[in-house]
Structure formats: structure tokens, C-alpha cells
């Protein structure tokens, strides 16, 4: 598996489209917004997995204790259930490196507090 450092440059607008079609039904990025089926992703970068206040995470997410950054998200988004066995997230992942890079570009800007 290629790493984020080998990924193509991400495109914010393409990532926004991916978020709206693949992620927004379960997540929001809006500061102060409540959780949906999944946690609010605002402030995602630099945060440890399973620590968003007010959201009930699986033990797997809490115990993984990964700090979210471009590299960890790139690997996670390929196959969430393989990266964190036991996660509640039902999303199958993004197989294309460009899609993952685009989504990360969007999330990096859209989730900054």
C-alpha cells in the first residue's frame, strides 16, 4: 500500500463532493454541530481516535489510540474495518489514492477549528 507521501496532490473541491456523497449522511464538519450517526469531525487533525466529546465510540476506536493526520487518515480511509477492527463505521473505504487525497484535502480545511 502506498503512503500519503506518495499520493497525488489532493483537490479541495473534489474532496468536498466526496464528503457530501460518501460521508455527510453520517458525519458533519461544522463547529458546534451535534453528532450524527458518526461523530462530528470538526477538529479532527491532531485528535486521538475515540475521543470526541459526547460521542459513544466502540472500544476498538478508543483502544486504537491513533492520532489523526494525513498519513493515518490515508491508511484508514482505504479500509476502515481493516485499520480498526471492530469499528462501528460501516463505510467500506475509498480504494482510489486520488479520492483519499482529495477527501483529506477537504477535511484538513473544513475541520480546522
From Swiss-Prot:
<keyword id="KW-0813">Transport</keyword>
<dbReference type="InterPro" id="IPR009056">
    <property type="entry name" value="Cyt_c-like_dom"/>
</dbReference>
<protein>
    <recommendedName>
        <fullName>Cytochrome c</fullName>
    </recommendedName>
</protein>
<keyword id="KW-0496">Mitochondrion</keyword>
<feature type="binding site" description="covalent">
    <location>
        <position position="23"/>
    </location>
    <ligand>
        <name>heme c</name>
    </ligand>
</feature>
<keyword id="KW-0349">Heme</keyword>
<dbReference type="Pfam" id="PF00034">
    <property type="entry name" value="Cytochrom_C"/>
</dbReference>
<dbReference type="InterPro" id="IPR002327">
    <property type="entry name" value="Cyt_c_1A/1B"/>
</dbReference>
<keyword id="KW-0488">Methylation</keyword>
<keyword id="KW-0249">Electron transport</keyword>
<comment type="similarity">
    <text>Belongs to the cytochrome c family.</text>
</comment>
<feature type="modified residue" description="N6,N6,N6-trimethyllysine">
    <location>
        <position position="81"/>
    </location>
</feature>
<feature type="modified residue" description="N-acetylalanine">
    <location>
        <position position="2"/>
    </location>
</feature>
<keyword id="KW-0007">Acetylation</keyword>
<dbReference type="GO" id="GO:0046872">
    <property type="term" value="F:metal ion binding"/>
</dbReference>
<dbReference type="InterPro" id="IPR036909">
    <property type="entry name" value="Cyt_c-like_dom_sf"/>
</dbReference>
<comment type="function">
    <text>Electron carrier protein. The oxidized form of the cytochrome c heme group can accept an electron from the heme group of the cytochrome c1 subunit of cytochrome reductase. Cytochrome c then transfers this electron to the cytochrome oxidase complex, the final protein carrier in the mitochondrial electron-transport chain.</text>
</comment>
<feature type="binding site" description="axial binding residue">
    <location>
        <position position="27"/>
    </location>
    <ligand>
        <name>heme c</name>
    </ligand>
</feature>
<dbReference type="GO" id="GO:0020037">
    <property type="term" value="F:heme binding"/>
</dbReference>
<keyword id="KW-0479">Metal-binding</keyword>
<feature type="binding site" description="axial binding residue">
    <location>
        <position position="89"/>
    </location>
    <ligand>
        <name>heme c</name>
    </ligand>
</feature>
<dbReference type="GO" id="GO:0009055">
    <property type="term" value="F:electron transfer activity"/>
</dbReference>
<keyword id="KW-0679">Respiratory chain</keyword>
<feature type="binding site" description="covalent">
    <location>
        <position position="26"/>
    </location>
    <ligand>
        <name>heme c</name>
    </ligand>
</feature>
<keyword id="KW-0408">Iron</keyword>
<feature type="modified residue" description="N6,N6,N6-trimethyllysine">
    <location>
        <position position="95"/>
    </location>
</feature>
<dbReference type="GO" id="GO:0005758">
    <property type="term" value="C:mitochondrial intermembrane space"/>
</dbReference>
